[in-house]
Curated annotation (Swiss-Prot):
Gene name tied to this protein: CM-LOX1
Origin species: Oryza sativa subsp. japonica
Pfam families, A to Z: Lipoxygenase, PLAT
Signal peptide residue numbers: none
Protein's name in the database: Lipoxygenase 7, chloroplastic
Region (Disordered): 231-315
SMART domains reported in the protein's UniProt record: LH2
């Protein structure tokens, strides 16, 4: 394994006597454009691609072979010299056709469309204030690359100006522009030139719309990292003011072109003004429903419920958090295509059934037709119901040419084995190598006991007995022996769901149980499904009911067993979507993004480390609040908890979420799936050796940890440097006290008091945003696209639930196949969820992957670059390791006849639904 070592004490700096070089002396990105002599090794030139939203441009980046650490001040007194000529080349991304080119009107003809001002890193020695900026207007120049527009400006920088530390940009056009980068080139008149690259990758608003949220001037700092205390004197106020602009003042409604980051509670999921049934409780800021915070929009309160926010218009996110044009186009095309596929059986269902959402599939043959033959698309006029399913798409459906035959892609697991969903072995295997590998846990005591109040919910002790389990284990050992040997495992959805059973059952066309599912680890390393317990708590009108189901050769019990598995799969689907996926990788991450942008300057090394791992997350979360998790949205219409779905995620946040166990090793230990062992690989001994998610995930965790440790060591040599970083401490304080304010006093929050604690905290954030999310997101269509394998909802109770409904029991005995299909999601529910999973599981064409070249750090410090090279190389190695494991027939949980290889932790992928690839961020 590559483990690049960084030496934070290295302070060698490339110097030059020319004034052009000294203009850029504050940057570690000094690049001599002269051809170096064969004996020179102090400057190493490298070409790399700038990180842009969907484009690539090659710029020259040069770094000292023993570069200055950001703590050091590499500036020097500027020798007396004549004014230096500096050329600026600004690259602007063309976003919609040739829109920017067409907008170059009279302002551009007279050369006043883009104002640039050079900012010195030094203060004026006489006044003690910032030096006057050097200003010039940029003019449009021809460029062979039609994806960008290039502007150039010339400056005569006076002697004594000092190193250039930043550039101020004013957009004098009538519309916003996406500024990719600015490259400054200084010449000394003797043929010597130096280059200072400045990363921008940001939307710059027109001067005409400037206000508190969208300032008319934007500052972009040179690609040089500084801890707050080492900021050059001439840049300190700029650094402070830029952060203040991003914080805003907490008032007013945010506009689409703002760049303000602030917090609010989840009070925008309901829509009480539209319909009283769509009112939802506020999540966050109260003891009943604690929750992370979201981005504040400032929309006015609801008329009927002042605590709720109105749901008008597009949900605000800061302008730089929006999708790139490429991402937006891909997302729209993917969504439209998927919804068209879902629309066919859904529209047919609505035409045939006045109950609309509740018509089951008439046969498994019809389900198969979705993938095999396709179905004919009805007219668009029959699809108006989609306005209530996936808002804002109907107009695109009208404009999209449709094929006469539409067909869902066959999910990968069904391609491998059409009947895998029926097998107990596959049910068990997917707890280790499916899309919710975070739910299974070790059985550590027996009998199984609930922590709920028995006076309310019934006896705490489970109905699963030792004798029953031992019978299913064929008496090879006792339960006591199995527990001591760590061979019993379970899915425990009992205490989480039981308090909501009667609430959910009061709703139409859904049901709920508390459930426990027990597995036995066999000698060949696979799991055997032993028993399922389903529980209905007591109510004022009925006593508690519970029953344990086991595999059976009896026809009736065999079908009851299949129905019990369908209920557990629906429980697992809800747990996965609401908790493992939404809560832990989307919702809990948004506060990190808000706090980082409010408290960490863009020249802060930790901001530069984290920024790639926040890409698109806020926009995706905002869209989820609009259509996915909102009242009457797809989750509520299609998953068992329905209107109580988000309440349940709040309960899970209260009872289960803690930052310290979001780290993969700690999560495995918490669930009993591993124990600490310094002699074992990764320092952990797994309870199940062939646990594909854990085995591959730990490789990724260690690679991230090694990279982050190296990066942190470059900037923080000791505990004092961490504790003394005021921006870093403010960031972490705000995460705890504001972003996760309902848990601010929890004792488990780590303290950032050493390089080690900082590296571990950052590794956890990167892991959750990248690898955790990839593990639970990009396999959703492969495992859930064929919904009998993973139904999102169970709609009918078990036929044997007491008091037994005689008519329902007769129908079950007469046609158990139909009874199972009636328990499954309806045609509308199933196909809409299939369409959504297809979108969620897909990589866009502009995806940026963990360790990819597009997200290489902009700080061109040679040691940082070497560490990143090692990180990228290690991830390539891991791909090979995973491929090898998937071909190893001894690993039966990932290799075998009809078994889908486990590839969700493979770092890289092509676009589309691939079942692999780890994007840098919580992205779809």
């Amino acid at each position: 394994m590559l483990r690049p070592q960084l030496n934070p004490s290295s302070h060698t700096t490339t110097t030059s006597s020319s004034s052009s070089t000294q203009l850029f002396a504050s940057s570690s990105c000094i690049a001599s454009l002269r051809r170096p002599s064969s004996s020179s090794s102090s400057v190493v030139a490298a070409a790399r691609r700038t990180r842009g939203q969907g484009s690539s441009r090659v710029v020259v980046v040069c770094a000292s072979s023993s570069a200055t650490a950001s703590r050091g001040d590499s500036s020097s007194d500027m020798a007396a010299a004549a004014a230096v000529r500096v050329k600026a080349v600004a690259t602007i991304k063309v976003t919609v056709g040739e829109l920017i080119n067409r907008s170059i009107d009279i302002r551009d003809l007279i050369g006043r469309s883009l104002s640039l001002e050079l900012v010195s890193s030094e203060l004026d020695a006489k006044t003690g204030k910032e030096k006057a900026t050097v200003r010039s207007y940029a003019h449009n120049v021809d460029d062979d690359d039609h994806s960008v527009v290039t502007y150039e400006a010339d400056f005569d920088v006076p002697s004594g100006f000092g190193p250039i530390g930043a550039i101020i940009v004013t957009n004098e056009l009538r519309q916003e522009m996406f500024l990719e980068d600015i490259n400054l080139t200084a010449s000394d008149g003797a043929g010597n030139s130096t280059v200072l690259p400045i990363r921008c990758n940001s939307w710059v608003q027109p001067k005409s719309v400037g206000d508190e949220g969208t300032p008319s001037k934007r500052i972009f700092f040179a690609n040089k990292t500084y801890l707050p205390g080492q900021t050059p004197a001439g840049l300190r106020s700029y650094r402070k003011n830029d952060l203040q602009q991003k914080r805003g003042d907490g008032t007013g409604e945010r506009e689409a072109d703002d760049r303000v980051y602030d917090y609010d509670v989840y009070n925008d999921l309901g829509n009480p003004d539209s319909n009283g049934d769509l009112a939802r409780p506020v999540l966050g800021g109260n003891k009943q429903f604690p929750y992370p915070r979201r981005c504040r929009t400032g929309r006015p309160p609801s008329k009927k419920d002042p605590k709720s926010e109105t749901r008008k218009g597009n949900v605000y996110v800061p302008r730089d958090e929006e999708f790139s044009p490429e991402k937006e186009d891909y997302f729209l095309r993917k969504t439209v295509g998927s919804v068209l596929q879902a629309a066919v059986p859904a529209a047919q269902s609505l035409l045939l059934d006045k109950l609309k959402w509740n018509l089951p599939f008439p046969s498994f043959f019809v389900i198969d037709k979705l993938f095999e033959d396709g179905v004919e698309l009805p007219g668009v006029d029959k699809l108006n119901f989609l306005e209530s399913v996936v808002p804002r798409l109907l107009e695109h459906l009208r404009d999209t040419p449709a094929e006469k035959i539409l067909r869902f892609e066959t999910p990968a697991n069904i391609q491998k084995d059409k009947f895998a969903w029926l097998r107990d072995e596959e049910f068990a295997r997917e707890t280790l190598a499916g899309i919710n590998p975070y739910a299974i846990e070790l059985v550590r005591e027996f009998p199984l006991k609930s922590k709920l109040d028995p006076a309310v919910y019934g006896p705490a002790e489970s109905a699963i007995t030792a004798d029953l389990l031992e019978e299913q284990m064929r008496r090879v050992m006792t339960v006591e022996e199995a527990i001591s040997q760590k061979r019993l495992f379970m899915l425990d959805f009992h205490d989480l769901f039981l308090p909501y059973v009667h609430k959910i059952r009061s709703l139409d066309h859904t049901t709920m149980y508390g459930s426990r599912t027990v597995f036995f680890l066999t000698d060949d390393g696979t799991l055997q499904l032993l028993a399922i317990e389903l529980t209905r708590p007591a109510s004022p009108s009925q006593p508690q009911w519970r029953q344990v189901f086991t595999p059976s050769t009896d026809a009736t019990m065999s079908w009851l067993w299949r129905m019990a598995k369908a209920h557990v799969r629906a429980h697992d689907a809800g747990h996965h979507e609401l908790i493992t996926h939404w809560l832990r990788t989307h919702c809990a991450v948004e506060p990190y993004i808000i706090a980082a942008n409010r408290q960490l300057s863009e020249m802060h090394p930790i901001y530069q480390l984290l920024r790639p791992h926040f890409r698109y997350t806020m926009r995706i979360n905002a869209r989820a609040r609009s259509a996915l998790i909102s009242a009457g949205g797809i989750i509520e219409r299609s998953f068992s908890p329905q209107k109580y779905s988000m309440e349940l995620s709040s309960v899970a946040y209260d009872k289960l979420w803690r930052f310290d166990t979001e780290a993969l090793p700690a999560d495995l230990v918490r669930r009993g799936m591993a124990e600490e062992d310094p002699t074992a690989e990764h320092g952990l001994k797994l309870a199940i050796e062939d646990y594909p998610f854990a085995n591959d995930g730990l490789l990724i965790w260690d690679a991230i940890k090694t990279w982050v440790q190296a990066y942190v060591a470059r900037f923080y040599p000791d505990a004092d440097s961490v504790a003394g970083d005021e921006e870093l401490q403010a960031f972490w304080t705000e995460v705890r006290t504001k972003g996760h304010g309902d848990k601010k006093d929890a004792p488990w929050w780590p303290k950032l008091d050493s390089p080690e604690s900082l590296a571990h905290t950052l590794t956890t954030i990167v892991w959750v945003a990248a690898a955790h999310h990839a593990a639970v997101n990009f396999g959703q269509y492969d495992f859930g696209g064929y919904f009998p394998n993973r139904p999102s909802i169970a709609r009918t109770v078990m036929p044997v639930e007491e008091p037994v409904d005689g008519a329902a029991m007769e129908r079950f005995l007469d046609n158990p196949d139909q009874a199972l299909r009636e328990c499954f999601p309806s045609q509308v529910q199933a196909t809409v969820v299939m369409a959504v999973l297809d979108v969620l599981s897909s990589h866009s064409t502009d995806e940026e992957y963990l360790g990819g070249e597009q997200t290489r750090p902009w700080n061109s410090d040679a040691a940082v670059q070497a560490a990143y090279d090692g990180f990228a190389a290690r991830l390539k190695e891991i791909e090979g390791v995973i491929d090898g494991r998937n071909k190893d027939r001894k690993l039966k949980n990932r290799c075998g006849a009809g078994i889908l290889p486990y590839q969700l932790m493979k770092p890289f992928s092509d676009s589309g639904v691939t079942g692999m690839g780890i994007p840098n961020s919580t992205s779809i």
